[in-house]
């Protein structure tokens, strides 16, 4: 195993713990690490490119071949969860509209690229996951401003054109470039370049988490009952996304790999993108709901995968896989 492979394996195995550590460092030393925020857009563009090298335009055809699960995932991601976030914000924080804005922003952003890693670990349908991630990533420059405009309207003043442009730079263009390289090299780039970039993509995510956490420091230094309530709301919505994805899969009578993908894609969000947007376009209070999520998202996802494996269908699927070896 090469040094890069060892580093990648170490980061992948300990990512949940490392994320918590980087969040704590960012909160503890915000003055030292806050300058990183000036480079978050470039860092995010690199992370998107590196994580999108695993598929091309042909993989997107999976959406057309099995449209219903993908449509349901998108409905949960961009209709159900944003509406629930809006309702939670208005119900719990009627005097703090910026907290409501932060909750809605958190559930307007696309599904997380990290879901590719977790779906693979969870024995899910990786082809479907890749299609969802790529399509959602490409649509993000248009879906995010539209969701904020429809749900928040005049509550939020934002430069929509600038936001779309920055999302194109951070998300859409890097993803399209990666897909084009995959297509032109007939997939060779996934076996050669992607593994070499993988540890650097994970390190980039940790740096982004560190930068995002610096924005939480002012809040956590003066913790209040309202902030505790906000943290609980963020955690509850996070769990709800996973739960709705899994229950939707059960209603569709989907097989276990599809159920894993629907649950994880519905629950994992691209928090780094939300934090970059919150820092660039909104007051500080908007950042807190978004920036706090990385503290527990990865650890929660690890627990969700174990729960899925412990279900009756999960045990049967894993046992069948062991017998076929």
Q: Can you annotate each of these PLM segments?
A:
Residues 1-325:
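Alpha-helical transmembrane segments of multi-pass small-molecule/ion transporters
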């Amino acid at each position: 195993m090469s040094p890069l492979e060892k580093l990648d394996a170490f980061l992948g195995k300990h990512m949940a713990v490392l994320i918590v550590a980087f969040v704590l460092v960012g909160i503890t030393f915000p003055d030292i690490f806050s300058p990183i925020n000036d480079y978050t857009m470039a860092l995010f563009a690199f992370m998107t490119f590196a994580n999108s090298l695993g598929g091309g335009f042909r993989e997107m055809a999976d959406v057309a071949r099995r449209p219903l699960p993908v449509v349901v995932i998108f409905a949960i991601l961009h209709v159900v969860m944003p509406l629930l976030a809006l309702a939670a914000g208005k119900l719990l924080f009627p005097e703090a509209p910026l907290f409501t804005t932060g909750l809605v922003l958190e559930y307007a952003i696309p599904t997380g690229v990290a879901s590719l890693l977790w779906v693979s670990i969870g024995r899910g349908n990786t082809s479907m996951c890749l299609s969802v991630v790529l399509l959602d990533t490409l649509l993000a420059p248009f879906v995010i401003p539209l969701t904020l405009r429809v749900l928040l309207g005049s509550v939020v003043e934002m430069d929509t054109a600038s936001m779309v442009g920055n999302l194109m730079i951070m998300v859409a263009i890097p993803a399209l470039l990666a897909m084009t390289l995959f297509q032109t090299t007939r997939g060779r780039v996934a076996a050669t370049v992607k593994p070499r970039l993988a540890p650097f993509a994970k390190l980039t995510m940790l740096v982004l988490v560190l930068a995002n956490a610096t924005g939480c420091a002012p809040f956590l230094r003066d913790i209040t009952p309202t902030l505790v309530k906000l943290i609980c709301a963020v955690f509850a919505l996070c769990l709800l996304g996973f739960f709705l994805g899994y229950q939707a899969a059960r209603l569709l009578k989907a097989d276990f790999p599809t159920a894993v993908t629907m649950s994880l894609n519905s629950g994992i969000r691209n928090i780094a993108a939300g934090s970059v947007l919150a820092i660039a376009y909104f007051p500080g209070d908007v950042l807190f709901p978004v920036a706090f999520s990385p503290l527990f998202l990865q650890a929660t996802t690890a627990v969700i995968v174990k729960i899925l494996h412990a279900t009756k269908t999960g045990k049967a699927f894993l046992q069948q896989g062991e017998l076929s070896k």
